[in-house]
Amino acid sequence: MSTPEVVREVQSLETYNPLAKQKAAAKLSRIPVKVVQGEILKKPDWIRVKAGSPSTRFYEIKQILRENKLNTVCEEASCPNIGECFGKGTATFMIMGDKCTRRCPFCDVGHGRPDPLDADEPLNLARTIAALKLKYVVITSVDRDDLRDGGSGHFVECIQRIRELSPGTTIEVLVPDFRGRDDRALEILKTSPPDVMNHNLETAPRLYKEARPGSDYQFSLNLLKKFKALHPDVPTKSGIMVGLGETDEEILQVMQDMRDHGINMLTIGQYLAPSTSHLPVRRYVHPDTFKMFEEKAYEMGFSHAAVGAMVRSSYHADQQAHAAGVSDKPAE
């Protein structure tokens, strides 16, 4: 795992270091859209975050991750649920480094020139999962637009190593869009498909230019549709954030688009800005509205919908999968 210089302030041409991990203002100063800050909204009472506690496994998990040179999206993306998840001994592993080739202004994962892939990472990951005796794991990654296969081969290596050491573990992958490489990536994933295939749409198509520069709404939908055609028995999953400026009607349309493309599982959660340099929160969605989204999801035919302010794509992912009908594997 790399330990690059972390830069948070805007850099001049003279001080710009392409090898540094850029965060916050440094990361977002070069995106093609300008992040306009408005009034900072007060967090409502229903937004509550659980902190890590020394009496739980929080610090044990952090130590194990460092010893095995592993990253988690929980840490890199500043997930508000990290205290609860680490405290219960769960984590979402982030492979292929800690520097993303994209600069999405809602995301706190660092940007920069990625390091070469770590050939030892799949085995280190598999050994860690085996040592922790995890029954369900989520593997995600940074975007790796620099790789000819988008990183799909590395995903497959990780899946294979995990299944060798932990054959009873269910594997969910949260993949990038493999922009321009989707057919190649899906062909590679055919050799060792996951148990759950997740790719997040994140927001309504109207907001893609602002929130997901470099990504395409229809491309993301088609990625999951193509995967489902190849693996009809593997559940597909996607997630949406609310609070970026979308309307309720736009969220409902995204949900319907998901169902029209064969997506089985859904997550919807409240967007929380990682810093004042990121896209601002434009509304806090009331619990009653989340309840409406959940009810509509089941009416549309989703096998499971995890909907609520603090829901994230990987939050209680095992419970989401079980509720959608994904069974635990027998230990061998």
UniProtKB/Swiss-Prot annotation:
Its main location: cytoplasm. Keywords: 4Fe-4S, Cytoplasm, Iron, Iron-sulfur, Metal-binding, S-adenosyl-L-methionine, Transferase. InterPro entries: Aldolase_TIM, Elp3/MiaA/NifB-like_rSAM, Lipoyl_synth, rSAM. Its cofactor is [4Fe-4S] cluster. [4Fe-4S] cluster 2 binds at C100, C104, C107. PROSITE patterns: RADICAL_SAM. Binds 2 [4Fe-4S] clusters per subunit. One cluster is coordinated with 3 cysteines and an exchangeable S-adenosyl-L-methionine. NCBIfam families: lipA, PRK05481.1, PRK12928.1. Belongs to the radical SAM superfamily. Lipoyl synthase family. This is Lipoyl synthase. The gene is lipA.
